[in-house]
Amino acid sequence: MSRSVFSTLRPVIGQKTTLAPFAFSLRHASSSSSPFSTPTEPTSFHTQPSHSTPTGPLPLTWPSYLSLRRQRRLWSTLTSVPTTFLGLFLGGGYFASLEADPSQLIFGVEPMFVYGGATLGCMALGYLIGPSVGATLFSLTHPSIARGNPAPLEVMDREFYHRIRKNRADPRFQSVQNIVPDFYGEKIVSLSTYRRWLRDQAVYKRKAMHGVPGEDL
C-alpha cells in the first residue's frame, strides 16, 4: 500500500523539482534592472516627468550642443545692442516731439525729467527684449534643431539643466563670502568648462561643510 502511494506521489515531486529552476529564472529576471534605468535617481525627479532624462539616445552630441548653445547665447547678446539703441531712439524721438510746459507738473515732477526717465525706460525695455529676439532669430536660422515635437534643441536643454540641477551645490548654505559659482551653468560652453564647473561645485560643497558647523550635510 505504501509503495503504491509513493509511486503515485513521485511524479508530483518530480514536477515540483522541474518547476523550481523555472521559478528561479523568473525571480532572477524580475529582480534584474535595465541598463538604461536609474534606480538611484532622487524621488523629486520622478515627480516631474517633464524634466526627466530621456530613455532613448540623445539627438545631439554634447560637444555639438554646447557649441550651438554658445552660438545662441552670442546671438542673444549681439541682438541686445541694436534693440537697446532702437528703444532709445524710438522713445527719445517720441517724447522729444511732445510739448513740455514747465508750469504743468506730472505727478509733481517737471515734464522734462519725466520724459527723460521714460526714454531711459524705453532703452531698458529694448535691452530686455534683445535676448528673446536673438533666440528667435537663431531658431529661424537653425530649423533642423529648433523645430519638432519635441525639438532636438529642447531635448538637449532639458537634459542639460537636469544634469546642472543634479550636480550643483545646495544654495541654502551660501553666504556673502561663499556664493554658489555659476548656479545655472551659464558659463558652460564646452566639455572642459563643464568639468571645471563640476570641480567648482565640489570646492563649494567642501567649503559649505567646514563653514556651517552643526549641520549634517
Curated annotation (Swiss-Prot):
Key words, A-Z: Membrane, Mitochondrion, Mitochondrion inner membrane, Protein transport, Transit peptide, Translocation, Transmembrane, Transmembrane helix, Transport
Domain of life: Eukaryota
Annotated Low complexity bias: 33-45
InterPro entries, per the entry: Pam17 (IPR013875)
Presence of the UniProt keyword Membrane in the record: yes
Topology versus the membrane: Multi-pass membrane protein
Protein name from the UniProt record: Presequence translocated-associated motor subunit PAM17, mitochondrial
Organism listed in the record: Cryptococcus neoformans var. neoformans serotype D (strain JEC21 / ATCC MYA-565)
Record keyword S-adenosyl-L-methionine present: no
